[in-house]
Amino acid sequence: MAFNIHNRNLLSLEHHTNRELRYLLDLTRDLKAK
């Protein structure tokens, strides 16, 4: 499931849910593995 992270500040983690943060971590892991 994708999340809309457009125009969101990733420097401030307080505005993100745990689910969104997990998605971003999984996405970076997958991109790094390519």
Swiss-Prot record:
One of its GO terms (biological process) is arginine catabolic process to ornithine. GO terms for molecular function: ornithine carbamoyltransferase activity. Its main location: cytoplasm. Pathway: Amino-acid degradation; L-arginine degradation via ADI pathway; carbamoyl phosphate from L-arginine: step 2/2. It comes from the Bacteria. The keyword Signal does not apply. It is found in: Cytoplasm. Its EC number is 2.1.3.3. One of its GO terms (cellular component) is cytoplasm. It catalyses: carbamoyl phosphate + L-ornithine = L-citrulline + phosphate + H(+). Keywords: Arginine metabolism, Cytoplasm, Transferase. Probably nonameric or dodecameric. Belongs to the aspartate/ornithine carbamoyltransferase superfamily. OTCase family. This is Ornithine carbamoyltransferase, catabolic. The gene is arcB.
